[in-house]
Amino acid sequence: MQTRNAFSWLKKQITRSISVSLMIYILTRTSISSAYPIFAQQGYENPREATGRIVCANCHLANKPVEIEVPQAVLPDTVFEAVVRIPYDMQLKQVLANGKKGGLNVGAVLILPEGFELAPSDRISPEMKEKIGNLSFQSYRPNKKNILVIGPVPGKKYSEITFPILSPDPATKKDVHFLKYPIYVGGNRGRGQIYPDGSKSNNTVYNATAAGIVSKIIRKEKGGYEITITDASEGRQVVDIIPPGPELLVSEGESIKFDQPLTSNPNVGGFGQGDAEIVLQDPLRVQGLLFFLASVILAQIFLVLKKKQFEKVQLAEMNF
């Protein structure tokens, strides 16, 4: 009986431990994912707004360049490279969530035409796999295979990202046609300045929420500050909380205005977007073009031969 009770108690403890561990894992994963660019998947059905703006710009406020390179034209059911470049100064360090400095991560979203999608691994050549490295791409939504996201990944290693893309075949996909299509890309380097809920991260500037005198500055044990602003005319006090990371620009006794920066702007990253065009080429059209070029070349050759033959006949008549 005691053995059965002991076994039952042990079983309950193991079950409880597993449940707690699973809960911690889920919470940790959620907090981590919400801090990175792909959180847009959770809040937006489509990453590109009707205005053409990519939603990543809502959280990454600084404007930075991004480049995309794709072939001018591709044939149906072929794998090609879409190369996205996210340039930045590799010597830069960003403010991390804990207030310390670290390297920049990068991320990208690639919006392909309907029908285009990530190439399956068995269709990717060894040379292309070497360019891709250890990157793991995912669809923006299960039903939106033409929109791909990647990141965050180390910027020093992946400031150039190669997407392996499979072109559609109009013979099997009736809604796809041989046309010129646009491709849109968004790329960021570094952390954002605003979280999905609208709150600020520690990677941005903090402004005064009231005008008055800085009456007290308390440096918090884990980093950051509590700044007390006293409005002498109204006799009220406002406390602004500064997280670890940004550098303080004001001192006690200083008179400040409403919305005046209390800190520096630590952000060294930013987001950019661009576009390109690609033609889904009809193989029959290519064959027709090659046939036409071959016929033109043959016609030129026959014309030259005919001209030489005519010159020989003329020369023979003159000698006669």
Swiss-Prot record:
Annotated cofactor note: Binds 1 heme group covalently.
Cofactor(s) this protein requires: heme
Residues forming coiled coils: none
Keywords: Chloroplast, Electron transport, Heme, Iron, Membrane, Metal-binding, Photosynthesis, Plastid, Signal, Thylakoid, Transmembrane, Transmembrane helix, Transport
Signal peptide: 1-35
Membrane topology annotation: Single-pass membrane protein
Listed transmembrane segments: 286-305
Subcellular localization: Plastid, Chloroplast thylakoid membrane
GO molecular function, a single term: heme binding
A GO term from the CC aspect: chloroplast thylakoid membrane
Tagged with keyword Thylakoid: yes
Keyword Thylakoid listed: yes
Entries under InterPro entries matching the protein: Cyt-f_TM (IPR024058), Cyt_f (IPR002325), Cyt_f_lg_dom (IPR024094), Cyt_f_lg_dom_sf (IPR036826), Rudment_hybrid_motif (IPR011054)
Binding-site positions, heme: 36, 56, 59-60
Location (main, coarse): plastid
GO BP annotations listed: photosynthesis
Function summary: Component of the cytochrome b6-f complex, which mediates electron transfer between photosystem II (PSII) and photosystem I (PSI), cyclic electron flow around PSI, and state transitions.
Family, similarity comment: Belongs to the cytochrome f family.
Oligomeric and partner information: The 4 large subunits of the cytochrome b6-f complex are cytochrome b6, subunit IV (17 kDa polypeptide, petD), cytochrome f and the Rieske protein, while the 4 small subunits are PetG, PetL, PetM and PetN. The complex functions as a dimer.
HAMAP family given in the database record: Cytb6_f_cytF
Full protein name: Cytochrome f
Organism: Atropa belladonna
